[in-house]
Amino acid sequence: MTFQTLDDLDDGQRVLVRLDLNSPVEDGTVQDNRRFDRHAETVSELVDRGFEVAVLAHQGRPGRDDFVSLAQHAEILADHIDHDVDFVDETYGPQAIHDIADLDGGDVLVLENTRMCDDELPEEDPEVKSQTEFVQTLKDEFDAYINDAYSAAHRSHASLVGFPLVMDAYAGRVMETEYEANTAIAEKEFDGQVTMVVGGTKATDVIDVMTHLDEKVDDFLLGGIAGELFLRAAGYPVGYDIDDANLYDEQWEENSEKIESMLEDHRDQITLAVDLAYEDDGDRAEQAVDDIEEKSVSYLDVGSETVMEYSPVIRDSEAVFVKGALGMFEDERFSVGTAGVLEAIADTDCFSVVGGGDTSRAIEMYGMEEDEFGHVSIAGGAYIRALTGAELVGVEVLQR
């Protein structure tokens, strides 16, 4: 790790802090989640050390229902740090500049959604982003820039990559811990068995992860939609798209050759589900994959026998990495797979990193604690890229 951290920053300065507070929004209401918990550590430390703090963050994308103001985020953050947090409905307009100038030591000000700025979203080179009006207007108002948004570090957006080229830049505590944990699989050497639980909805993510880690990982335990696509490649009639959802057929057409090739080349490393769960008259029902005769049911989870097969593999591992959920865990009926493997990991002393998609949410939903795992990542896309060894531009600019 070659970037500067908060340990290298003198107390009491005025700092611009990029967080990732992007959250689920239901009926216009921002939902509290673990990202606020995590980033509260960084913000609370800055407050305690007398910094004047202005926060940058994004929410949703233009045109979507979750594209809302950060006013609610400021209130939620205040609850998490048990400290007053102000909000201004501009990102770098005259009122924002005025409120920034009025900051005193220990004050926290949340600026408006960065994605409401025209300069923010286009993916462009960091050098281009550093010259935008957004960056050039704010850079002289602060002593330093802190990026704590590891989960957005794969995006070349102005608030993430522009400021480090024109200001002293540091990594926040979330950036620091996520980077160390999520690069461990690429850098750490293990003497014993390394297992990866791979689920989720995107076949391309699974293919990329397995391709890059086939020499590091001894066993891939598959589930989710991606796992069903591998079952289809093995000859099972699964992957039924309900209500024209196009979760399976489109991905199969795009990735079938890669999946079939991977299954053929690495069959001894890949463990597939032996049974699957579906809804039957409102209840959970399970079926052995060997008994499936036609593609006519939408499967929503791996079955209990699969969890029983996966659990001993996990218990015998020195290290376990998790990418994505094994089923539709938000519905308790179909949480058996995801909750089952997470409980198996929690019951061991292995080195573990859990991340990807909503997996961290499953830990909270089913009564587990984060400290039962080595590290629980709040990152999605950045986690996948870290696993595959891809460069994270938001990290790279901090290391310059």
Curated annotation (Swiss-Prot):
Give the record's pathway.
Answer: Carbohydrate degradation; glycolysis; pyruvate from D-glyceraldehyde 3-phosphate: step 2/5
Q: Which GO terms describe its molecular function?
A: ADP binding; ATP binding; phosphoglycerate kinase activity
Q: Which cellular component terms (GO) are annotated to the entry?
A: cytosol
Gene3D superfamilies tied to this protein:
Phosphoglycerate kinase, N-terminal domain
Name the record gives this protein: Phosphoglycerate kinase
Keyword Thylakoid carried by entry: no
Q: Which organism is it from?
A: Haloarcula marismortui (strain ATCC 43049 / DSM 3752 / JCM 8966 / VKM B-1809) (Halobacterium marismortui)
Show the taxonomic lineage: Archaea, Methanobacteriati, Methanobacteriota, Stenosarchaea group, Halobacteria
Amino acids binding ATP: 330, 356-359
What the record says about family reads: Belongs to the phosphoglycerate kinase family.
User: Quaternary arrangement and interactors, per the entry?
Assistant: Monomer.
Q: Which SUPFAM superfamilies match?
A: Phosphoglycerate kinase
Q: Which UniProt keywords apply?
A: ATP-binding, Cytoplasm, Glycolysis, Kinase, Nucleotide-binding, Transferase
**EC number(s) on file:** 2.7.2.3
Record's PANTHER family?
A: PHOSPHOGLYCERATE KINASE, PHOSPHOGLYCERATE KINASE 1, CHLOROPLASTIC-RELATED
Source domain of life is: Archaea
Specify which residues bind substrate according to the UniProt entry for this protein.
20-22, 35, 58-61, 115, 155
Q: What is its main location?
A: cytoplasm
Reactions catalysed, semicolon-separated, are:
(2R)-3-phosphoglycerate + ATP = (2R)-3-phospho-glyceroyl phosphate + ADP
Gene Ontology annotations of biological process type: gluconeogenesis; glycolytic process
Localization of this protein: Cytoplasm
